[in-house]
Amino acid sequence: PAFYLDFKAYRAGDPNYKSTTRDVKRLLTELEKEKVDGVVIDLRNNGGGSLQEATELTGLFIDQGPTVLVRNSDGRVDVLADENTGIYYKGPLAVLVNRLSASASEIFAGAMQDYHRALILGGQTFGKGTVQTIQPLNHGELKLTLAKFYRVSGQSTQHQGVIPDIQYPDVMDTKEIGESALPEAL
């Protein structure tokens, strides 16, 4: 899934706003009724999305606790956490990743790995461990890096990504993909 959240409806207080976590929760309910043996979440080629959704989705699979740490440019560290007690889905879980899994995908996969909650399979992820915002300009936009995020383990994914528990080769050449391939990346 992409880590989407209908920000406009959410901020307006619409109780039916759309989000990744709500959709995954509904699908998990259906799968549990079918008595599946386990669930595979495919984050290959997933560029990320909402940091809030990455945290909330993680919360479906862990029993409360930090999901990601965000260090702002002033040095302040904010801890984003699942504050809901209980695990929504307790069954076996695998997460598929590749070099094009980035940002919120890495936050989710990293948290699942740090909590020993899922088996991470595939290739090393993109290595985007930063948080950006887009500022509109008169003739375009400017993307600003505001913060760096860290996994629950304290590791940064910047330039190194998430290393899967079980790696397998990718069908494409990934040497030139990712933050580490950019000469001036932070």
Identify the residue ranges that each predicted region occupies.
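Cleft-lining beta-strand/loop regions that shape enzyme active-site pockets
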Residues: 1-138, 148
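Acidic, S/T/G-rich, low-cysteine, solvent-exposed domains in lumenal/extracellular/periplasmic regions
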Residues: 136-140, 160-162
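Short, small/polar residue-rich loop motifs at catalytic or cofactor-binding pockets
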Residues: 143-144
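Conserved functional hotspot residues or short segments at active or partner-binding sites
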Residues: 157-186
